[in-house]
């Protein structure tokens, strides 16, 4: 079996191998492409992170606790070879290993906007797109239901009086079918100048099923004054799998270092009654309402139909740290 993965600046090749009559296993080859002045640093960091991730994977995987593997640079010094010796990984195990290797492991916490705060921006964007499609458009069309953007991105409104509606005060600014997200992304790029400069939009990680269609939420993230997230994975000291006392579903408990805990206390204290979004590798996993200041440097990732296997993978990725380059899979 041979599979190929293109990794932004990394190519991963996996194959089952058999070098000797009684010697078989699974081999993973990683090729790194970087500028000369940072090449060694990237290679060393990739080796370090991958070794930690695979070690944690073996510890959690039945039958692999004592599995032997090696990680080393090839002779040309441009690739990293990972060998599982005398162990042929099953299809599901290979998929898990590739997921561990291709995930950059980028954890971020964001303050958020609400749809109530942005509804005028979305209305103007919808009108601009509608006028582009039809320059002679009448101005009295029903903006809540019509127009290129609103035909695909459905918003939530509360009725506050007969015939009068108010945009919901939620960080989820709309929901759309998964198949429509690329078209919506393009529309929002075309109308970017109508939105706040510190707004960043991100989709939820797992779809909900509505009328047999996969539907994702679009979450309004608010950038810090330096155009970054409010807090990132560098604040994390540990992570572990737990199960909710409320519904028994898996969740990830995150513990922060001293500096991270202080920042988390400030962030939660400044956002009581608002939502904080927890983003992993670009997708929103959870955006809970802050009910009180959190002084103990702890946070929980849950929801999004998170499975135990996915939770274990994320815990292992967080424990091992980020890869220096993002990873994407190509058939």
Regions found by a protein language model. Name each.
Residues 3-4, 271, 310:
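Hydrophobic alpha-helical segments and their boundary regions
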Residues 298-331:
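Extended, hydrophilic extramembrane loops/domains of integral membrane proteins
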């Amino acid at each position: 079996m041979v599979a190929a993965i293109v990794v932004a600046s990394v190519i991963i090749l996996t194959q089952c191998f058999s070098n000797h009559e009684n010697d078989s296993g699974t081999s993973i080859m990683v090729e790194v492409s970087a500028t000369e002045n940072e090449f060694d640093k990237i290679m060393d960091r990739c080796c370090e992170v991958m070794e930690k991730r695979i070690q944690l994977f073996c510890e959690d995987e039945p039958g692999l606790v004592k599995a032997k593997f090696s990680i080393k640079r090839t002779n040309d010094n441009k690739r990293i070879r990972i060998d599982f010796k005398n162990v042929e990984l099953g299809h599901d195990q290979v998929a898990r290993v590739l997921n561990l290797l291709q995930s950059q492991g980028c954890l971020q916490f964001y303050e958020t906007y609400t749809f109530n705060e942005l509804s005028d921006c979305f209305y103007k964007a919808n009108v601009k797109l509608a006028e582009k499609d039809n320059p002679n458009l009448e101005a009295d069309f029903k903006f809540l239901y019509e127009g290129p953007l609103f035909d695909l991105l459905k918003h939530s409104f509360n009725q506050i009086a007969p015939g009068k509606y108010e945009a919901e005060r939620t960080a989820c600014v709309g929901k759309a079918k998964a198949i429509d997200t690329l078209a919506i992304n393009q529309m929002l790029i075309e109308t970017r100048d109508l939105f706040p400069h510190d707004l960043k939009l991100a989709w939820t990680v797992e779809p909900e099923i509505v009328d047999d269609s996969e539907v994702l939420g679009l979450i309004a993230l608010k950038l810090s004054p330096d155009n970054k997230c409010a807090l990132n994975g560098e604040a994390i000291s540990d992570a572990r799998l737990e199960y909710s006392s409320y519904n028994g579903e898996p969740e990830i408990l995150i513990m922060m270092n001293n500096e991270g805990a202080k920042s988390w206390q400030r962030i939660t204290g400044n956002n009581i009654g608002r939502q904080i979004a927890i983003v992993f590798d670009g997708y929103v996993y959870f955006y809970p309402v802050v009910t009180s200041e959190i002084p103990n440097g702890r946070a929980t990732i849950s929801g999004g139909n998170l499975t135990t296997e996915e939770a274990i993978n994320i815990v292992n990725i967080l424990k091992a740290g980020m890869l220096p380059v993002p990873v994407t899979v190509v058939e």
